[in-house]
Amino acid sequence: MDKIIECVPNYSEGRNKEVIDLIVKAIADTTVNTERGEERVRVLDVDPGEATNRTVVTFVGSPEAVMEAAFQGEKKAAELIDMRQHHGAHPRSGATDVLPLIPVAGTTLDECAGWARTLAKRIYD
């Protein structure tokens, strides 16, 4: 069985459609080459909230594709969202508040935790 994971990042922008669209595009346009060929993630949902000024994006794919798309989404959010200008009803900690990796098929929570640590290190570096 192929490994499939889900990522549900929360971005600190829920009002500016142009910024939201650019972040989602960065995620959706990401491709990775694996032993199975070129892969992309599938964006399942984009849920902006005006009052909270936050958007939740849901996407799935192989661990390699999800990790790269998550990195590219976080990178684009950090580039476009000015937290000094951010106001919303929901507490926030940065342009990307949370970036969870969730096992869907053929994988475990422990594997997702390892991938999350790898992704966090890449973002930090």
Predicted regions mapped to residue ranges:
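Long, contiguous binding/interaction regions
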Residues: 1-125
